[in-house]
């Protein structure tokens, strides 16, 4: 797999679990002999939901809920077969969405 690049994009609602997953990926890739660029923090998506507190009236009384999606990007440059096997066996925390592009 010479001159190839694996791009890993991570998404999670909690930034601490996202950072631990990124650290595990970087540590695994460097241990197996590949170069790593990242983790690069990408912009956080912020979804805001406004809901009326009362069921029938009192429209002036509202409550707002926010949901943030944190993202990180990790590039693995010139991965070996050993790197790919180690990444496939890697156990990441739940709640982290992983997208891999070759």
From Swiss-Prot:
TM regions (residue ranges): none
Gene3D superfamilies noted in UniProt: Ribosomal protein S10 domain (3.30.70.600)
Pfam families: Ribosomal_S10
GO molecular function: structural constituent of ribosome; tRNA binding
One GO cellular component term: ribosome
UniProt keyword list: Ribonucleoprotein, Ribosomal protein
Keyword Ribosomal protein set for record: yes
Highest taxon listed in the record's lineage: Bacteria
InterPro entries reported for this sequence: Ribosomal_uS10 (IPR001848), Ribosomal_uS10_CS (IPR018268), Ribosomal_uS10_dom (IPR027486), Ribosomal_uS10_dom_sf (IPR036838)
BP-aspect Gene Ontology terms: translation
Family: Belongs to the universal ribosomal protein uS10 family.
NCBIfam families according to UniProt: PRK00596.1 (NF001861), rpsJ_bact (TIGR01049)
Assembly and oligomerization: Part of the 30S ribosomal subunit.
Function per UniProt: Involved in the binding of tRNA to the ribosomes.
Name of the protein in question: Small ribosomal subunit protein uS10
Organism: Streptococcus pyogenes serotype M12 (strain MGAS2096)
Gene behind this protein: rpsJ
């Amino acid at each position: 797999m010479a001159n190839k690049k694996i791009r890993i994009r991570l998404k999670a609602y909690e930034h601490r679990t996202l950072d631990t997953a990124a650290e595990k990926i970087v540590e695994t890739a460097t241990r197996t002999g590949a170069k790593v660029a990242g983790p690069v923090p990408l912009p956080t998506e912020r979804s805001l939901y406004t809901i009326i507190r009362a069921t029938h009236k009192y429209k002036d009384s509202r409550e707002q809920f926010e949901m943030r999606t944190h993202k990180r990007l990790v590039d693995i440059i010139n991965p070996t077969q050993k790197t790919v096997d180690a990444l496939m066996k890697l156990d990441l925390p739940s709640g982290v969405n992983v997208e891999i592009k070759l």
